[in-house]
């Protein structure tokens, strides 16, 4: 929940979908709602909750949700509903304040727009799975992610997933925090970028190491320069013998 609440999900490492064991949907929705609303009991008109950057981006997020619902997805809002106009406006994103409450999208499929591009908003698709191999296959089927988040206490299962997938960075049992750790490099791999900054690696990445070669006054390299003659032939013959 924290990863989608920070800046209303408008960060490059906000989670774009959740892979959830089938049968835990209701439990997850309740836990997500509790976690999302603990620091932010109300999203509408809350100055501590970020707005969507532009009206155009807000319209894009609305379209994503409408398309998903039209294709059979179920949307659960983290803002309480009701008969009041304020609640209704908040659900679809207030056009004046451009705030949109976090929303879970169940029954999301790969054919939906929100599963085909970076969401960059407070919408979180949920994909149910039956086997751990389904998790690995789903992650590896898409572009290599900038961040991957694992939640669970079984270290063997965790290590199995992390060893079989590729991502820019990982946070275990939380989100976003590998970005903030001063001793960890941050960066992507493949489609999510290349190279890293932060920490010692960042200093090297963002510094230029100027190469300087100083030729000594007496150098054997001059014997290898043209024009080539008998002396060069003798040198090459010796090199062939010893090498």
Where do the PLM segments sit?
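ALDH superfamily catalytic-core signature
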Residues: 1-109, 132, 172, 240-241
């Amino acid at each position: 929940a924290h990863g989608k609440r920070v800046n209303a999900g408008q960060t490059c490492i906000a989670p774009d979908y959740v892979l959830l064991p089938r049968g835990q949907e209701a439990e997850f929705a309740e836990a997500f709602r509790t976690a999302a609303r603990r620091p932010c009991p109300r999203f509408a008109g809350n100055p501590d909750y970020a707005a969507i950057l532009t009206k155009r981006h807000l319209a894009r997020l609305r379209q994503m949700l409408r398309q998903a619902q039209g294709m059979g997805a179920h949307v659960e809002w983290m803002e309480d509903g009701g008969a009041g106009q304020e609640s209704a406006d908040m659900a679809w994103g207030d056009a004046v304040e451009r705030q949109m409450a976090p929303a879970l999208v169940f029954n999301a499929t790969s054919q939906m727009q929100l599963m085909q591009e970076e969401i960059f908003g407070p919408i979180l698709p949920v994909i149910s799975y039956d086997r751990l191999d389904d998790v690995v296959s789903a992650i590896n089927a898409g572009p290599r992610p900038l961040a991957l988040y694992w939640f669970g206490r079984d270290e063997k299962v965790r290590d199995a997933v992390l060893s079989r997938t590729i991502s820019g960075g990982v946070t275990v049992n939380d989100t976003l925090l590998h970005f903030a750790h001063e001793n960890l490099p941050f960066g992507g791999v493949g489609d999510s970028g290349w190279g890293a900054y932060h920490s010692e690696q960042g200093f090297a990445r963002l510094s230029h190491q100027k190469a300087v070669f100083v030729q000594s006054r007496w150098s054997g390299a001059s014997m290898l320069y043209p024009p080539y003659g008998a002396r060069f032939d003798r040198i090459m013959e010796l090199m062939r013998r010893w090498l």
